[in-house]
């Protein structure tokens, strides 16, 4: 089967690939990963990925997590050097539910301060677990050697001291105009 690609007037690009499966997948791929972070923002993309599930203007965290699970679906996200992706897997009759939920968490997250404080500790635990894994550390050292002094050489999770400095006001700040050409 062949996919179709559309670009909406607001610049949102939609890729649709028909399938015969009863299971559907959809997501938002946000063209902002750790390579787009300034030195003092290391880990911000991954941090935001965690926080978007913690509340929106109309939903509490528990409602976000249960919205797809209640119909047998799954909601998840990941961050890499190039992008942050929020996605869902579900029975195709729940497409509208999935799109509405994904749109809500991507565009209307509230980043409550109490959730920022809790999630900071969750991610610091994740960093400590990561640091106990030699194969992960070797890969980080390898990337650091190749991309020395470039955001691509940094760890996606960030640094505990920077995570502790993140506040709601930083998360709402628009990205500074940076060179759109990726080097």
Where do the language-model regions lie?
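Active/ligand-binding-proximal structured segments within catalytic/core domains
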Residues: 18-68
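Acidic/histidine-enriched segments that form metal/cofactor-coordinating
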Residues: 57, 64-170
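N- or domain-start disorder-to-order transition segments that initiate the globular core
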Residues: 1-23
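Residues embedded in well-ordered beta-strands
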Residues: 13, 25-29, 85
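Non-catalytic surface loops within mature trypsin-like serine protease
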Residues: 10, 32, 90-92
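Conserved small/polar residues in nucleotide/adenosyl-binding loops
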Residues: 172-179
């Amino acid at each position: 089967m062949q996919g179709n690609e559309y670009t909406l007037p607001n610049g949102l690009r939609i890729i649709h690939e028909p399938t015969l499966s009863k299971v559907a997948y959809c997501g938002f791929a946000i063209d902002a990963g750790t390579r787009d972070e300034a030195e003092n923002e290391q880990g911000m993309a991954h941090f935001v990925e965690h926080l978007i599930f913690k509340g929106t203007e109309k939903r509490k965290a528990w409602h976000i997590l249960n919205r797809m699970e209640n119909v047998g679906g799954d909601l998840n996200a990941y961050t890499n050097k190039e992008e942050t992706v929020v996605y869902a897997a579900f029975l195709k009759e729940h497409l509208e539910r999935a799109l509405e939920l994904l749109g809500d968490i991507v565009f209307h997250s509230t980043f409550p301060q109490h959730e920022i404080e809790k999630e900071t500790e969750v991610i610091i635990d994740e960093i400590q677990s990561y640091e106990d894994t030699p194969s992960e550390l070797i890969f980080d050292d390898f990337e650091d050697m190749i991309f020395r002094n470039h955001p691509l050489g940094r760890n996606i999770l960030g640094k505990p001291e920077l995570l502790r400095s993140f506040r709601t006001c930083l998360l709402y700040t628009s990205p500074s105009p940076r060179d759109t050409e990726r080097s």
